[in-house]
Amino acid sequence: MPNSKKSKKGGDQQHVTIVPVEPVKGENVDTVAYSSRSRISGESGHLIADVQSPHAKKHRIIFDRDHNVFEFRLLDGSAKHIIVYRLDELLSTTCYPFKIKNGVPIIPTKPTTSDKTLYFNFVYKKDKQKWRLKQIPVIFYTTSERDYWHSLIDTTLRRVKNRPKNIIIFINPFGGNGKAQKIFKDNVDAFFWLTPGLRYKVVLTERANHARDYIVEMPPEQWSAIDGLVSVGGDGLFNELLSGALLRTQTDAGRNIDNPSSHLVTPHIRFGIIGAGSANSIVSTVHETNDHATSAVHIAIGSECNVDVCTVHQHQKLIRISANAISYGWLGDVLRDSEEYRCLGPIRYQWSALRTTIRHPIYRGMVQFSLSHKENVNPKDQLPPCLEPCPVCMKPQGNDKYDYHWHAEFTHVICCVIPTVTPFTPYGLAPFTGIGDGTLDLALVPRISRFHNMQFMRKVAMYGGKQLYELDPSLNCYRVTKWSYQPDADQEDPGVWNLDGEILEQPKDEPLHFKLHPQLISFFGRDAAMVKPTKRSFIKKRKSSIVYQ
């Protein structure tokens, strides 16, 4: 592209080269004056500029507006040294540099604008899980040319539909051992600050259910204006955001959320989590890491994936909503016991696990369920006979709500909405289910000994649910769409549920019903297998600091 060209009148006039959709050569390339660039119809074509690196190496930038990619090419007489970035990998462009520490930007207090340099701030995949930011400085030949590119790219990024424009961030100041605010300030805030067109409001929660009530009571004009809700805390805070948004959406749509058979409406907003809790299983499952900067990157660039949700009902009334894991028996008792030792921090779970193992709780009850169409196994061929007396077996016509049932003594009853990756289950708890595959994994473990239970939990941590399903014959696991549990009435303690890290009391004389709602919500995240890690070459970087970062 001509960088500046003397006009016949003696003045300087900026030119921009636009290449049409079908590449042509010679005289068919249009040269459009800077002052008349608004005449360019649509957003197609190629924008080209010859630039320099900080080491004075000549390069060419091509912005392909048809395919939304940037091509950086070293002009050394060969076509070998080229790198291409997608538009959705560009966080922003700035006219000033800023510090980047371990791939995390630091907001400058007094940014100093460079004369002709434009800084491209790209996000990239550092390894198999983590995402980081890198800055590519590009030196144009004139300041006006630099400003034009900056204005054009900034406007383009603001128009990207999937990028959030207005989000509310809820921070639990007690999360992460009281470090949630610091986590947000040091690892997240700068990403949002750099994102063009992103407005965000921070709300510090003051009590339990504060976030849920805030969302439910939000004025209609504010609710319709936001397009994202972000939690900085543990799974409990995210559950508040999820519950509040779903309640608000169903109320506005006139849906009866208390009815398990209702077809629920998907909220218009997306959810994000910055993990600052003890387990952080939801964010670890979606991103395959609990890394704060990675979560911030996916929110800022507008990554999106759909996630299943499970509603919990008692007597035709909604009592809880889950997008993680629901467990009963040993795991529920561990959570209940750990509440007495919150002062110990995350280590309280190990202490309570030891205490619960010694106590070795066993619960007798009835599990009923209906299989997903993706399940190929017939439970009647695998499940042992029911304990007698079984209320369903005694009925001549069985149960019209569920296809299968099992009355037994249980050590574990576990339902996974997502694979459930945690520090204690790094390979995932669920054998089969995915993030949004439209199934629940229902795992039933009958009465087993203390030693067997210790071996069972050790195998879960070492191999994950998928390998455990093949190693332990006591595990009965099925892919279901709905199910229920009712404890026997003669038990003094009906037990509790561990629902997304929060305690849910099991009624003594009534069943709880669990219903799957496939891909009900959208999450700021993407399939980890879609993008390969970026490989660096320090030798080649000497040749081009733009192409080889």
UniProtKB/Swiss-Prot annotation:
GO cellular component, one term: membrane
Active site: 235 (proton donor/acceptor)
Keywords: ATP-binding, Kinase, Lipid metabolism, Nucleotide-binding, Sphingolipid metabolism, Transferase
Catalytic reactions on record: an N-acylsphing-4-enine + ATP = an N-acylsphing-4-enine 1-phosphate + ADP + H(+); an N-acyl-15-methylhexadecasphing-4-enine + ATP = an N-acyl-15-methylhexadecasphing-4-enine-1-phosphate + ADP + H(+)
One Gene Ontology biological process: ceramide metabolic process
Residue numbers binding ATP: 172-174, 205-209, 240, 277-279, 342, 348, 500-502
Keyword Transcription regulation among record annotations: no
Domain named DAGKc: residues: 162-316
InterPro entries per the UniProt record, alphabetical: ATP-NAD_kinase_N, Diacylglycerol_kinase_cat_dom, Lipid_Phosphate_FormReg, NAD/diacylglycerol_kinase_sf
Binding site for substrate: 233-236
EC number: 2.7.1.138
SUPFAM superfamilies xrefs: NAD kinase/diacylglycerol kinase-like (SSF111331)
Pathway in which this enzyme or protein is active: Lipid metabolism; sphingolipid metabolism
Recorded superkingdom: Eukaryota
GO molecular function annotation: ATP binding; ceramide kinase activity
Job of this protein: Catalyzes the phosphorylation of ceramide to form ceramide 1-phosphate. C.elegans contain specific sphingoid bases, which are unique or different in structure compared to the sphingoid bases found in other animals. Two examples of these distinctive compounds are: 15-methylhexadecasphinganine and 15-methylhexadecasphing-4-enine.
Record-linked PANTHER family: CERAMIDE KINASE, ISOFORM A, SPHINGOSINE KINASE
Name the UniProt record assigns to this protein: Ceramide kinase 1
Species for this entry: Caenorhabditis elegans
Underlying gene: cerk-1
